């Protein structure tokens, strides 16, 4: 995708915030528990390569991604010897590519292991479906059979076993405890304990540090975002958001009563008012549902009016502003702030989606 360096819309990533979130999490982990930085989906919209570099500087011992291509991008960017685990499903025909690049793969079907052609040992993490209902084996019998199959092939290594919690970001823990018990039953059924046993995502690592096992997968909270609003007041330390989104007014005009703006003429001025056009739209991740939300101009709230367009958005100004004035979509401005959580609440979604939607057409600038 083309990145818009010649357009006054940009994202700022505070690397110091990422480092602080990692350090605070590491301070509460036992010394023998590694922290793996989850950098899938372009690091939740923050930029995979720069975030990976920042996380490694802060002490992360490895990385988790969703697809093999993300793992290969890290290798190509210079992360040659770092642990990398692909959490999602990988095609069988790509197993050799992963093996040659020393990339660990998630496996959850015995038939996937049959008739592999490998030029290097393949590191495998067995995924257990303890209650998420996505990928994973569900029985002791499946686990034992896969362990036997791996042991019979000297090109296969059972490096890890893991699961993913569906409700770790909730205060009620009964389902979480059921999942943990199911996972432990399968774990103890193995003849040999793998090198890495890991279960904790951000929420679990923050609220249930006792189940760290050998490593945690630190994702959303590395970026300073709360796993859910429900647990926000129960966190052991303050998270520092790393992402801010800015743009500038490219056209400022005064509307007369009866003037309408944007597609469908859904907004009509009822009095004389100032509006500004912003060079950002739903093609950038500022989806149409943002209509009716607000931004900050000079620290004051300014509503988004009319329909958000593919490349442009219109806001109602509290007064006349100069063309080129800075606009804050996510971030702080003169003592006021709009957070990813604020946007998520308005959009009836989660903060993960808000930042992941911000695509690579918006340039990232890395600070500190």
Curated annotation (Swiss-Prot):
Transmembrane segments: none annotated. PROSITE patterns: ALANINE_RACEMASE. GO terms for molecular function: alanine racemase activity; pyridoxal phosphate binding. The keyword Cell inner membrane does not apply. Its cofactor is pyridoxal 5'-phosphate. Keywords: Isomerase, Pyridoxal phosphate. Substrate binds at residues 134, 310. It comes from the Bacteria. It catalyses: L-alanine = D-alanine. One of its GO terms (cellular component) is cytosol. It is an enzyme of class 5 (isomerase). Pathway: Amino-acid biosynthesis; D-alanine biosynthesis; D-alanine from L-alanine: step 1/1. Its EC number is 5.1.1.1. The active site is at 40 (proton acceptor), 263 (proton acceptor). The modification N6-(pyridoxal phosphate)lysine is found at residue 40. The keyword Chloroplast does not apply. One of its GO terms (biological process) is peptidoglycan biosynthetic process. Pfam families: Ala_racemase_C, Ala_racemase_N. Belongs to the alanine racemase family. Catalyzes the interconversion of L-alanine and D-alanine. May also act on other amino acids. This is Alanine racemase.
